[in-house]
Curated annotation (Swiss-Prot):
Name assigned to this protein: Basic phospholipase A2 PA-11
Cofactor requirements of the protein: Ca(2+)
Gene3D superfamilies: Phospholipase A2 domain
Species, as recorded: Pseudechis australis (Mulga snake)
GO molecular function: calcium ion binding; calcium-dependent phospholipase A2 activity; phospholipid binding
E.C. numbers: 3.1.1.4
Family: Belongs to the phospholipase A2 family. Group I subfamily. D49 sub-subfamily.
Record-linked InterPro entries: PLipase_A2 (IPR001211), PLipase_A2_Asp_AS (IPR033112), PLipase_A2_dom (IPR016090), PLipase_A2_dom_sf (IPR036444), PLipase_A2_His_AS (IPR033113)
GO biological process: arachidonate secretion; lipid catabolic process; phospholipid metabolic process
Disulfide linkage: 11-71, 27-117, 29-45, 44-98, 51-91, 60-84, 78-89
Alphabetical list of PANTHER family matching this protein: PHOSPHOLIPASE A2 (PTHR11716:SF51), PHOSPHOLIPASE A2 FAMILY MEMBER (PTHR11716)
């Protein structure tokens, strides 16, 4: 679920940036998404959005699905049984790892999406 996703982000980025910093970033980080991603981090969010969309098509509710995972050496690892829990966990873990690798550009936080996300 979204709280677990926030915790995964903290795991992967070693707590270096609050999870909420990603909630209003670029064109895809946060609710909804459209246009061309503004950078690598925003692309991580676009991929995550697409993953959640696929989960929804499988009958899952990714924002609410509780799953089992652990943080080992700043790597989020899923240990849920196959099905919605495993699928959603994999979406979140991949995004958290992607976030940890991508540079965070302050100028892409809280942008005017109407102008920049076409």
């Amino acid at each position: 679920n979204l709280i677990q996703f926030g915790n995964m982000i903290q795991c992967a980025n070693k707590g270096s940036r609050p999870s909420l910093d990603y909630a209003d970033y670029g064109c895809y980080c946060g609710w909804g998404g459209s246009g061309t991603p503004v950078d690598e981090l925003d692309r991580c969010c676009q991929v995550h959005d697409n993953c959640y969309e696929q989960a929804g098509k499988k009958g899952c509710f990714p924002k609410l699905t509780l799953y089992s995972w652990k943080c080992t050496g700043n790597v989020p690892t899923c240990n849920s049984k196959p099905g919605c829990k495993s699928f959603v966990c994999a979406c979140d873990a991949a995004a958290a790892k992607c976030f940890a690798k991508a540079p965070y550009k302050k100028e892409n936080y809280n942008i005017d999406t109407k102008k920049r996300c076409k």
